[in-house]
Amino acid sequence: MIVYEDEALVVLNKPAGLSSEGDLPARLRELWGAPDAYVGVIHRLDTGVSGLMVYAKTPAAAAELSRQVTQSQQAYAVLDGRAEPDGMAAPSPVFVKRYRAVIAGVPDEDLPAAGVLRDLLFKDSRKGRVFPVRRPRKGVREAVLEYRIAALSADQTRSLAEITLHTGRTHQIRVQFASRKHPLLGDGKYGSRVKGSIALQSCGLAFRHPVSGERMEFALDLPAELPWSAFSD
């Protein structure tokens, strides 16, 4: 589960089925044999999603990594045209999250082979779901992601998508693809008829070390099991 660890942070390969705010910090404290150890949550993954996450081991590291997350959100907003540059050239995002997903279908008019998806999303907390809407209103937030279709299954029924998040909305990737009639496999909440875990993996993570400033990059291989194995050749 642990990919990298030092005195300031720990990078994990989160298994599907564990919550990123409750289960994983508890597992870390158990591994360390330190029930009161500090574990700073920097970003989140849905419980049913697997892949890379970084946690801070000190409040100072948490503050710096959180600052990088905020900087990256602002940088993407400028790059996407959602915000004006602050008198200078738009900075490059520092904290970068990349994903891969297996989605139903192949590229079509609703979902070209590559592009940027922009939607207004409304989170209905009572129903535990997120819905795309057409107009801004209270509780609605803009969601933006960049993607490309990297491969098609041999039977031309599924696609492997590589995704870079520009915003970090609840269920964002799942909803944006499902709203274009390409739900993620295993995501019954948003329309998939395939049973199993949600076919979404946090496969890449990059940031600056909160103490040294060194650029750190982590990547995961394509999982060996279905449905990922359909794209392993």
Positions of PLM-derived features:
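RNA pseudouridine synthases
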Residues: 1-127, 135-142, 151-153, 225-231
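Pseudouridine synthases involved in rRNA/tRNA modification
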Residues: 1-22, 85, 156-158, 170-233
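Short Pro/Gly-enriched beta-strand edge/turn motifs at strand-loop
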Residues: 127-131, 142, 183-190
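Short histidine-centered loop motifs in beta-beta connectors
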Residues: 161-164
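Residue-level recognition of short loop/turn positions
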Residues: 126-127, 167, 211-212
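Long C-terminal interaction/binding lobes of large macromolecular proteins
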Residues: 147
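Short, P/G- and charge-enriched loop/turn segments at secondary-structure junctions
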Residues: 131-137, 192-194
